[in-house]
Curated annotation (Swiss-Prot):
Key words, A-Z: Membrane, Repeat, Transducer, WD repeat
Family annotation (Gene3D superfamilies): YVTN repeat-like/Quinoprotein amine dehydrogenase (2.130.10.10)
Source species: Tamias striatus (Eastern chipmunk)
This protein's record includes keyword GTP-binding: no
UniProt protein name: Guanine nucleotide-binding protein subunit beta-5
Subcellular location: Membrane
GO MF term (any one): protein-folding chaperone binding
Gene (name only): GNB5
Pfam families: WD40_Gbeta
Family: Belongs to the WD repeat G protein beta family.
Length: 353
């Protein structure tokens, strides 16, 4: 028996060393492609001029920290979720609340708007993702029409509808992501590969195929093929948890925001990190990132209550936005690119333009 154990250990050790040497070879191959820096390529590009953005609307109504928000495709409505267990649908033009749902649990960490605008999904410490249809009949009880779609073995950290209302993608503290059928609640595909909690995910723009990117507490950002369930690319250059990932509008790159106080840009075709957005004066983690519609600007919300705006090509900061009175937890650019909304632990959401 003891010899069996020894053999197993030896095999394990040899497999580990083989894996390490393969990793080394991969890094060498990656390094061969590393012939020029992004800011060098962008040297001839004109610098951005004066950049002014202000808070145009403040949405008040949550009784605790705002944890997540998403825009409706109609460019007007917003769904937000909070630590108080409430999920609210807002009209961002008038600041009116159109719907409110009280979840059975607090810490609703994830919420998403369906592409049709006719439903919302949310979840958190209840380990599941619930879908609520939205109707404008004031007497209708939304909670009665709730569908429980996804079941994880730990908290739900993020959710997103695919390009239809019929499928939903979830990320969880159990270290997995999963694709579910909304109607039947059936698991269609699961994605295993993260070594710790998955904190965020983002779907590739629809033209670029069936992939999504996820980030988590293992400091890894992973790109997945939704059809096969396989990880097709992985990037491990952050020094702490990855809180947010967002695809570049063309789908050829993605940005990440991390507790290591940096945001980074990864080029999928070059298969490597191409830019780091950081300053010595920024010492707090980045909680949320999103691109402008053109992809030239990167908006990043931080735990020091600020929002930094970065020039993606030149790597420089073009603006810093003040207004929130606690950490910025979530941030999304509107579908038409005219504004963005940020949510904060100060219980409010702000629409900037």
């Amino acid at each position: 028996m003891a010899t069996d154990g020894l053999h197993e250990n030896e095999t394990l050790a040899s497999l580990k060393s083989e894996a390490e040497s393969l990793k080394g070879k991969l890094e060498e191959e990656r390094a061969k492609l590393h012939d020029v820096e992004l800011h060098q390529v962008a040297e001839r590009v004109e610098a951005l001029g004066q950049f002014v953005m202000k808070t145009r609307r403040t949405l008040k109504g949550h009784g605790n920290k705002v944890l997540c928000m998403d825009w409706c495709k109609d460019k007007r409505r917003i769904v937000s979720s909070s630590q108080d267990g409430k999920v609210i649908v807002w009209d961002s033009f008038t600041t009116n609340k159109e719907h409110a749902v009280t979840m059975p649990c607090t810490w609703v960490m994830a919420c998403a708007y369906a592409p049709s605008g006719c439903a919302i999904a949310c979840g958190g410490l209840d380990n599941k993702c619930s879908v609520y249809p939205l109707t404008f009949d004031k007497n209708e009880n939304m909670a009665a029409k709730k569908k429980s779609v996804a079941m994880h073995t730990n908290y739900l950290s993020a959710c997103s509808f695919t390009n239809s209302d019929m499928q939903i993608l979830t990320a969880s503290g159990d270290g997995t992501c999963a694709l579910w059928d909304v109607e039947s609640g059936q698991l269609l595909q699961s994605f295993h590969g993260h070594g710790a909690d998955v904190l965020c995910l983002d779907l590739a723009p629809s033209e670029t195929g069936n992939t999504f990117v996820s980030g988590g507490c293992d400091k890894k950002a992973m790109v997945w093929d939704m059809r096969s369930g396989q990880c097709v690319q992985a990037f491990e250059t952050h020094e702490s948890d990855i809180n947010s990932v967002r695809y570049y509008p063309s789908g050829d790159a993605f940005a990440s925001g991390s507790d290591d106080a940096t945001c980074r840009l990864y080029d999928l075709r070059a298969d490597r990190e191409v830019a780091i957005y950081s300053k010595e004066s920024i010492i707090f983690g980045a909680s949320s990132v999103d691109f402008s519609l053109s992809g030239r600007l990167l908006f990043a919300g931080y735990n020091d209550y600020t929002i930094n705006v970065w020039d993606v090509l030149k790597g420089s900061r073009v603006s810093i936005l003040f207004g929130h009175e606690n950490r910025v937890s979530t941030l999304r650019v509107s579908p038409d690119g005219t504004a963005f909304c940020s949510g904060s632990w100060d219980h409010t959401l702000r629409v900037w333009a």
